[in-house]
A protein has these predicted regions:
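Active-site-proximal helix/loop segments of hydrolytic enzymes
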Residues: 1-177
Length: 177
């Protein structure tokens, strides 16, 4: 398992352009783009994962399964019955008139999936036009806690090492490394 961290300390690259995180990942020929973040939803009390609705939820489902098997809690939500607990599809963007578009909201998923997720063809994302025909990476957004829920932050702080170890185990198992 090779891991490449796409930013340096005090470096905050965005999701667009030649120096953005997706561009850095494409240049390294990454197979997986793992984005970590925190939710701002005060109702979220435990970690959850987002995947692209244009791809499968296989890795996230594997992580959910192993976390449950190891006594870890995920936010009890899922997009559909083919997904495990704590696994959601990203939402679609809407136009100014409320029409649902074919583009996802999270650039960490949309801009890393290449042509499968419409990378480089929406709004500011034209800065990633070089990747609109790329095969892309498997994108996974792992929301480790809610910044608006102290119970969620406490749970993460108490279980961060176990969550990280199970996430790595899931990646190794899913990709058969």
């Amino acid at each position: 398992l090779k891991v490449k961290i796409l930013r340096k300390e005090n470096d905050t690259p965005g999701d667009y352009g030649a120096n953005g995180r997706p561009a850095r990942a494409y240049k390294t020929k990454a197979k997986l783009y793992l984005a970590l973040g925190a939710s701002l939803d005060e109702n979220v009390y435990a970690p959850y994962m987002l995947t692209s609705p244009y791809t499968n939820s296989g890795l996230a489902n594997t992580a959910s399964y192993f976390m449950e098997q190891n006594g870890l809690t995920l936010y009890e939500a899922r997009t559909n019955t083919t997904q495990e607990n704590g696994v959601l599809y990203d939402s679609y963007a809407e136009s100014d008139d409320g029409k649902v578009l074919e583009y996802e909201l999270y650039p960490q998923l949309r801009e890393t999936g290449g042509r499968a997720t419409y990378a480089g063809v929406y709004g500011d994302e034209f800065k990633n036009v070089d990747y609109k025909d790329a095969y892309g990476m498997y994108g996974l957004y792992f929301s480790y806690a809610s910044a608006m829920n102290s119970q969620s932050v406490t749970y993460y702080n108490e279980n961060a090492d176990a969550i990280a170890k199970i996430l790595v185990k899931s990646i190794v198992r899913y990709f058969e490394i």
